[in-house]
């Protein structure tokens, strides 16, 4: 995922649903200008802050616009329940610079559901690749998912 993001030393990066930092830890081997991470769980936020890999912000990413700041790259694994992945990715896309690149893990459902939010997401013309069944079994989930790439 981090490799697909093609991170450059001049990039400002956003991880809007950072959890305990699995994705941002994978970014350690890359050079970039800045990294901003959002987390809604106070416990996870404390873990992120301790990583000292960038700016960890506590709060609901969906209610943020970062003061209009735009990011070159966005890497994310948003929550899937109740189509939250659509909400998170669509909102993150609005914070992407032009040109910019967003790479996300999303549920399979967004690619076949006929809800308004799924249709809005698909209108962004994402590239996607199905991940092997059981990819996240060690994390306690068997949800079918895809690796998604959106360019602006």
Where are these regions (language model features)?
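Class I S-adenosyl-L-methionine-dependent methyltransferase catalytic core
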Residues: 1-152
């Amino acid at each position: 995922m981090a490799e697909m993001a093609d991170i450059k030393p001049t990039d400002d990066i956003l991880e809007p649903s950072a959890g305990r930092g699995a994705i941002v830890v994978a970014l350690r081997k890359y050079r970039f200008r800045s990294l901003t991470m959002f987390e809604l769980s106070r416990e996870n936020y404390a873990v992120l802050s301790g990583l000292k890999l960038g700016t960890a912000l506590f709060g609901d990413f969906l209610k943020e616009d970062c003061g209009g700041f735009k990011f070159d790259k966005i890497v994310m694994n948003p929550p899937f329940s109740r189509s939250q992945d659509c909400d998170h990715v669509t909102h993150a896309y609005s914070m992407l610079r032009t040109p910019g690149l967003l790479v996300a893990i999303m549920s399979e459902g967004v690619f076949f559901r006929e809800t308004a939010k799924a249709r809005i997401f698909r209108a962004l013309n994402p590239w996607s690749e199905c991940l092997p069944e059981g990819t996240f079994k060690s994390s306690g989930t068997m949800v079918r998912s895809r690796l998604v790439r959106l360019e602006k």
